[in-house]
Amino acid sequence: MRKAINRPDDLALFGAPPLFAEPLHVGRPNTGNRDRLLARINAVLDSRRLTNNGPMVKAFEKALADYLGVRHCVAVCNGTLALEIAIRALNLTGEVIVPSFTFIATAHALQWQQITPVFADIDPLTCNLSPASVESMITPRTSGILGVHVWGRPCAVGALQEIADRRGLKLMFDAAHALGCSHRGRMVGNFGECEILSFHATKFFHTFEGGAIVTNNGELAEKLRLARNFGFRGADNVVCIGTNGKMNEVCAAMGLTGLESIADTISLNRANYERYAARISDVPGLLLMRHDTAERTNYQYVVMQVQEEFGLERDTLLEILHAENVLARRYFYPGCHAMEPYRSLFPDARLSLPHTIALSERVLSFPTGTAVGKKEIDAIGRLLSFVARHSARIRAHRGKRAAEKCSSS
């Protein structure tokens, strides 16, 4: 880490050395206790049982179900496949209402199965699906609602369930961000027909690659187990269409190891979040995403909205941060509706998504987890404070540099 930034010329954007010698990513994979992980992997290798619903997968499913307080956990090879299998098991067809403000996999999992994702707007306060927008999007072709717990903050579960019940729709949730979070005292995983989890290596809890569907519906769980294994019930009896969605034993070993230290990981995330909050408390125009302190949350993401009072546009700040090796990210930009194939299929979708568009142009997610410590967060806080205080000088300096570059070319 280099010396403090005192003037625009000290910014790496204008040619100075970066604040951090090595890039700081939004997250860094947690491996838990390495000795315990390697012991589990060695046990897998010694058993010669590498996949096909082995003992490590069964133990992981039970441990995760116990942690969440759900009856059934069906582990699969990734979160996207979990979405696809659940969508098929619920017999969704026609149209399903989803937010555009989500990772593209949520929409792709529907479109891949010839189901039309209908993009509803978000509530600007929660950043989750707006129940009023959902209600306005329902048509005779609508078969379900797919909510997303963005950044670990649960959707308006009760309102969405009321709409689903009243209109005869299936309700499921993409809980990829929300492992370890609660809503009204119940752990996420207990809502809707089922909830989907992602254990990709970028998540604070991971299985290298992996995912799961959790549900309290035994009949649905059986359909899911059949679907992840080609539809086999027994050695030679295929009873339904299926795919190869099985989690392997090594991934499950990582999951079991990660669960043992999940409380410590969340504690670290919370400490980082609170330190960011303290360091930017007097920075104008930066709005830190808040959590309901009465509920459990995983503090997986440190998300800020860059507002007009900051003095620079979000993307200009992003350029400054990246030049300093602070690899903040835009979550979610530009929204699913503005990506292919949806941009071409639904060119007018943007007209009904004003809050989605506004938020996607303001949000940044900052490095946290084991990627940063106290010194790094303090330095990022000082950088943000400097940029906000000197935003006018930075804009002028940037314009001057651009003019000089044009005149010399």
What are these regions (language model features)?
Residues 1-50, 169, 367:
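N-terminal "arm"/small-domain region of PLP-dependent enzymes with the aminotransferase-like
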Residues 5-12, 17, 88-175, 182:
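PLP-dependent aminotransferase-like
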Residues 23, 55-63, 67-73, 132, ...:
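PLP-dependent aminotransferase class I/II
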Residues 49-95, 101, 109-112, 119-121, ...:
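Phosphate-binding glycine-rich loop
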Residues 74, 97, 118, 171-172, ...:
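Structural detector of well-ordered beta-strand residues that form the stable sheet scaffold
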Residues 128-135, 185-194, 384-385:
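A short alpha/beta connector and helix-capping loop motif
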Residues 173-207, 234-239:
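Conserved active-site segment immediately N-terminal to the catalytic lysine
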Residues 190-226, 249-252:
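Active-site PLP attachment segment
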